[in-house]
Each structure stands twice: as C-alpha cells, then as structure tokens.
C-alpha cells in the first residue's frame, strides 16, 4: 500500500497486528505528549516498534485493508486527553520544518 508518514514527533505507544475482520485491524498509536495521540489504522504493514521515537514525516507503515474496511484506506485519528478531535486542524503538508518547530516552542513555553 501507499506509504504512511507520522504527522508529528512522538513515541510509538502501541502496535497491533490483526488480520481479523473486526475493529481497526493493524494499527499504530503514537503518543505526542501534552495529551495528544494519533492512530493510524487499517494498515498492511508496520515499519516501527513500540517505544520507537518518531519524527514528523517519518515513514511508519503501509496503507492496507485490515479490520472493518471495504477497500484500502487510512483511518487517521487525533485524540486529545482520550477524546477524538477533528484531525484537519493538526496537519499541513505545506508547513515548513521551521514553522513546525516555532509552533512546538510556543506550545512548550505556554506550559511553563
């Protein structure tokens, strides 16, 4: 399947390999800190392991058709404090690395 890339820095919290035709099938969950996690599901193959440090844009998996899925696609989910939120606000393919780092610094400084 098509390559799947992480949308932010984080640590792989879990990887689940499943060919059962239930749920999300094969999936990766990345913990980004500050209460944020992303889930990438219905994958064909996972290229990372639990505990791996991940960088934004890093290749993590191949798109697939596992779990409850009628055709190959990616289920992309953002959660904040375990509540699903609209993912459209959390990715921007055109954002430069410099702008991304600037935003991350603002988030970190607001926590202090």
Labelled PLM ranges:
Residues 6-50, 72-73, 77:
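Zn2+-dependent peptidoglycan hydrolase active-site motif and core
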Residues 49-58, 77-112:
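Acidic, glycine-rich catalytic/binding loops that coordinate metals and/or anionic ligands
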Residues 1, 68-69:
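Soluble non-cytosolic domains of exported or imported proteins
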Residues 3, 29, 39, 62, ...:
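Conserved beta-strand positions that form and line the central face of beta-propeller blades
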Residues 15-16, 46, 63-66, 90:
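Residue-level recognition of beta-strand microenvironments
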Residues 26-30, 55-67:
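Short hydrophobic beta/alpha edge segments that flank linear recognition/processing sites
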Residues 1-7, 101-102:
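Extracytoplasmic/periplasmic cell wall- or extracellular glycan-interacting regions that localize
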């Amino acid at each position: 399947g098509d390559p799947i890339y992480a949308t932010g820095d984080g640590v792989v919290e879990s990887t689940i390999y499943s060919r059962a035709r239930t749920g999300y099938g094969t999936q990766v969950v990345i913990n980004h800190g500050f209460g944020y996690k992303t889930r990438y599901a219905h994958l064909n193959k996972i290229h990372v392991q639990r505990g791996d440090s991940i960088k934004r844009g890093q290749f993590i998996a191949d798109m697939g058709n596992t779990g409850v899925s009628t055709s190959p696609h990616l289920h992309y989910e953002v959660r904040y404090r375990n509540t699903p939120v609209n993912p459209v606000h959390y990715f921007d393919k055109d954002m430069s690395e410099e702008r991304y780092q600037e935003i991350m610094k603002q988030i970190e400084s607001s926590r202090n």
